Amino acid sequence: FVYHASRLGAEGYAISAVGDDGLGREILEELDNNSIRYLIEKVPYPTGTVQVTLQDGVPDYIINERVAWDHLSPTSNAIDLAERADAICFGTLGQRSAQSRETIQAILSFAPDDAYRCFDINLRQHYYTKELIEESLYLANMLKVNDGELVVLRICFIWKERTRRCSLVYRTL
């Protein structure tokens, strides 16, 4: 999100955390090389990693736990950015730990009322609950969802005929 926003001329920032390790340094260097602004804390946990495999073109993820981005904190700089944001993108995966969930929701609470709050639902493995989805939907005014995630939403919220209409809206966006 921030990469594309930055390339389109917006003042985008990545807010996250990395470990004080080689992967963390590599990420920061890559962000610098691509002129992407960021507020990234170095925390005493390893930088997050994900193993991705493809089965018939469909990705499967193994997302490591107890990593840096599970330990976000609501810094004053992040709150300052939120207070002047035109758009904020967040998802369920980033909220998998209680600490990061509280941080993301706190940061969102400082955004202006007219800011876009894009909930990129990102349903991965067991890192979401119906309650987390509901909380996040209430915080959002825009939803990014794929076909597979739409099926999960239908099951979670017992949508029947509405699913067809929702998928038509999604496909026309």
Give residue ranges: language-model regions.
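Substrate-binding N-lobe of the ribokinase-like
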Residues: F1-V50, L54-V58, E65-H71
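Ribokinase/PfkB-type carbohydrate-kinase core domain
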Residues: E30-E41, Q55-L173
